[in-house]
Amino acid sequence: MTKTVIYNIVLFWLAWVVIILSFQWIVTTRLKIKHPDLAVAWTESETRLSSNKGKIYLLEPFMNRQVAWDSEYYVGIAIGGYDDPEAGRVINPVTGNEVIKNYSFFPFYPYVMRVFALPLRLLGLENPLAAASLAGVIVSALGTLAGLLALWDMTRPYFEEEDSYRAVFYALIFPTAFFFAMVYTEGLFIGLAFGALALSKRGHWVWASILGLLAVWTRAHGAVLALPLLIFWLMQIKWREPLKPQMTWKWFLRGALALMPLAGYLLWRNSALGEGWAELQEFYFGRGLMSIDSSIEAWKQAFDYARYTGGGHAQIYFAIEVGSVLLAFIASLWLIRRDPGVALFSLAIVLLSAFSGSAGSMARYMLIAPALYIFLAQLGRNKMFDRTWTVFSILLLGMEASLFAVDMWVG
């Protein structure tokens, strides 16, 4: 990767961040969006003008357009830790125990936010809520930059330079790509996960495993990184040649490093944080590992709500969700022959998300599947597709970013 490539990507990324944040301010200043939102069955009661009353981490005016929904927990953990007395609590109906909702979220992102907030407070941003919110946006944006550089690098073996740039461009204009600059984990995650993929393809196993480990502690999907790392490890073997000389201690060490994301997940899962996460996922969020029956029922209910009850709000939301999943699924299958490791990582993201027991947030979850952008970049070789997709995607991106800025539900 040359200095020119880095310069071009950094410049485009910086312009994109400024445009996204400015656009949210412009739209919310110029327009008044009517509440509540009927996107899904539960949003009508959660998107009224008074719905955030008492949620102190969502009420700070500074950077408020970038803080909504799950941002509350990341800001709260960054300021007060997991046992923050201001955190929301729910009762487990099975045990009757009170559970702090902060435990639903992984630690690495909010802890990095805490680190970034320290110099901001020293520079005069003394309000801890404001400092944590700005830190969250900075961490997300920097993670996104790292992810874009890694995406460009991992596609170069089979793409022309123009195609790799196009993949980066499509990543930043995907309809839900604004999340990369919000107080959400997607930006940091693609920096770590895409970085791990790119480094492992280059043979930098130690750094790849470290990034993979940190990705695991950013969100649960990080555990899936063990799959592509193992594939890249096995691809080092020349199967038509004698195997014994190739199976050196270094080769076995690389295999062990490839398993680091899975080991990191299991370590975290058996900690107090992991136990709390699993408990909340089951009874509060209704999610689990490949919960196929409950997922089918959730998708059916979402379809019925969109068709019969929610009207245009729900139908558009549901169409974006389904469209994103189908596009990422097709992209993953298309990429298997060209780049099996990245393809299977993306496919695992799609399947684990779609069959998690819930039919929500799919368009956001698909953001972390690199095959999506690689497939679009291939299609974008056709100039008509490139122009058409660019217009369509940017218009949806603007709509989604605007809705998020006023606390409407977009995933």
Please give the residue ranges for each predicted region:
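Short acidic/glycine- and proline-prone juxtamembrane loop motifs at membrane-interface regions
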Residues: 182-188, 362
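Transmembrane-helix motifs of polytopic, lipid-linked glycan transferases
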Residues: 113-117, 135-158, 327-331
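Loop-to-helix entry region of an early transmembrane alpha helix in multi-pass inner-membrane enzymes
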Residues: 97-107, 111, 122-149, 313-320
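Membrane-interface alpha helices of multi-pass inner-membrane proteins
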Residues: 172, 176-179, 193-198, 206-233, ...
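Membrane-lumen/periplasm interface segments of specific transmembrane helices
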Residues: 19-40, 214-216, 222-346
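Short hydrophobic/aromatic helix or loop-helix immediately within or flanking a transmembrane segment
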Residues: 68-125, 353
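Transmembrane-helix signature of polytopic, membrane-embedded enzymes
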Residues: 123-134, 151-173, 339-344
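Membrane-interface transmembrane helices that cradle and orient dolichyl/undecaprenyl
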Residues: 159-162, 196-207, 237-239
